[in-house]
């Protein structure tokens, strides 16, 4: 909750809508265990919104900016895709940001059935209809008539050998003047700078309540699953 001033009446507490959407705290890596490769399964889907908020610096700000960009560049009678839509939280934000009279179709794709199930619950009261499709971004996708295609921290999970093909599919799916919005974790070519970014990132996670054990175990689980590239790549 936060404080807001009522003119002439001092302060009152106001519950943030954002906090209401996060109901399950991420404790998946809290206890020592044999680390398995990270999967987007039921356990992860249940806590994923909290995991994102506490793992990615300026996550909410990036989502807000992406929604504003979509609202500006979405064209009437086209589709807006969220590739790797996970729990549907960005699609909901997008549905709230888009003008209702543009006849825009919102489509979310994800390979995880658990995530899509969670997304359907998230989007139950969406002001715009959203179509949910189970699809693997490592395989040939059937997407078209897109004025905007969004990838929020998703390309890094696509196998490196498949990324070029996926980007070509995305390009060919865009209508003239269409846009792709890519938000991604990247590595630096400068080793010292890259280490500094990693140190700052771990510090951020600790400030958000993660222990050193949680950070270490999750990092190990993501090894060879999340593979960031440099900007130049």
Which residues are covered by each model-predicted region?
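Conserved beta-strand signature within the Rossmann-like core of class I S-adenosyl-L-methionine
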Residues: 177-185
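N-terminal auxiliary segments of SAM/dcSAM-dependent transferases
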Residues: 21-37
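A conserved beta-strand element that flanks and buttresses the S-adenosyl-L-methionine
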Residues: 150
């Amino acid at each position: 909750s936060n404080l807001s001033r009522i003119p002439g009446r001092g302060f009152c507490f106001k519950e943030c809508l954002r906090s209401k959407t996060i109901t399950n705290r991420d404790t998946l890596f809290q206890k020592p265990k044999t680390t398995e490769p990270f999967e987007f399964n039921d356990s992860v889907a249940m806590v994923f919104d909290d995991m994102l908020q506490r793992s990615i610096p300026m996550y909410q700000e990036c989502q807000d900016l992406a929604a504003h960009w979509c609202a500006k560049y979405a064209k009437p009678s086209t589709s807006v895709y969220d590739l790797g839509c996970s729990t549907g939280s960005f699609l909901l934000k997008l549905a709230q940001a888009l003008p209702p009279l543009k006849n825009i179709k919102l489509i979310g794709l994800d390979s995880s059935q658990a995530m899509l199930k969670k997304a359907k619950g998230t989007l139950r009261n969406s002001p715009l209809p959203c179509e949910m499709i189970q699809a693997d971004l490592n395989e040939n996708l059937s997407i078209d008539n897109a004025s905007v295609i969004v990838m929020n921290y998703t390309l890094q999970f696509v196998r490196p050998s498949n990324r070029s093909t996926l980007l070509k599919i995305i390009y060919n799916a865009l209508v003239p003047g269409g846009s792709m919005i890519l938000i991604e974790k990247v590595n630096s070519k400068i080793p010292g700078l890259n280490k500094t970014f990693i140190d700052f990132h771990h510090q951020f996670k600790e400030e958000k309540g993660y222990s050193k054990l949680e950070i270490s175990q999750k990092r190990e689980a993501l090894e060879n699953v999340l593979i960031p590239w440099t900007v130049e790549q």
